[in-house]
């Protein structure tokens, strides 16, 4: 006699991301926070600061983390604040008008590749002048309405924080980035699965997860090799 056994006790691991919810009236803030357009738009930065000035300073001016940590009570206060809600609505309309402009099809499309991009300290994927130049190039491409796609890397630890010891020696402190709390989003394929690209390297295949950072009108695709497939 054969007995068919189902392995019901085997664990089924799934990724679970816990995020705080926003009231319907504030949903547009999440879209704004996940587009780095706010980096060079002072009205947007001032708005995020005014949502909670103390918290804004604590999260080092990262709007994604700011919204994640806003208290329920503060969210309710914002919704009831007519002046603040008017600013939110006006800013979102300004953002949508900016984003709805179609790329100039009379100019050639551009693919831009760089090892680092300096756009904001909330996205630690740069360390020096090369990154700052690349970041400015992408922002200018967005404002100039260039049909451009940029590609780079998403580093788990990014650059280090530098301090000095009592003896004057450099101390490097590495802090891991939580990709769910910075202005990037995972890219999915047509089947709804996280997109992964395979890159041949000597005798191996390197598997890179794909993320995207929205820099105004420009998509910045970031490859992340810090995963269990490697």
Locate each region found by the language model:
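Catalytic cores of carbohydrate-active enzymes across secretory and cytosolic contexts
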Residues: 1-230
């Amino acid at each position: 006699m054969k007995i068919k056994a189902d392995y019901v006790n085997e664990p089924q691991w799934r990724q679970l991301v816990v995020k705080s919810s926003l009231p319907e009236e504030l949903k547009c803030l999440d879209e704004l926070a996940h587009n780095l357009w706010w980096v060079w738009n002072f009205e947007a930065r001032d708005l995020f600061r005014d949502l909670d000035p103390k918290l804004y300073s604590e999260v080092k001016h990262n709007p994604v983390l700011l919204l994640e940590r806003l208290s329920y009570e503060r969210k309710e206060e914002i919704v009831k604040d007519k002046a603040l809600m008017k600013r939110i609505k006006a800013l979102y309309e300004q953002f949508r008008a900016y984003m709805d402009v179609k790329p100039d099809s009379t100019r050639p499309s551009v693919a831009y590749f760089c090892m680092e991009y300096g756009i904001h300290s909330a996205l630690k994927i740069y360390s020096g002048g090369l990154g700052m130049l690349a970041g400015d190039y992408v922002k200018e491409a967005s404002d100039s309405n260039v049909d451009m796609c940029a590609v780079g890397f998403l580093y788990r630890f990014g650059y280090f924080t530098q301090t000095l010891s009592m003896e004057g020696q450099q101390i490097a402190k590495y802090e891991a980035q939580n990709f769910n709390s910075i202005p990037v989003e995972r890219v999915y394929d047509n089947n709804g699965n996280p997109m992964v690209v395979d890159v041949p390297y000597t005798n191996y295949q390197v598997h890179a997860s794909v993320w995207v950072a929205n820099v105004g009108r420009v998509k910045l695709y970031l490859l992340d090799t810090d995963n269990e497939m490697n």
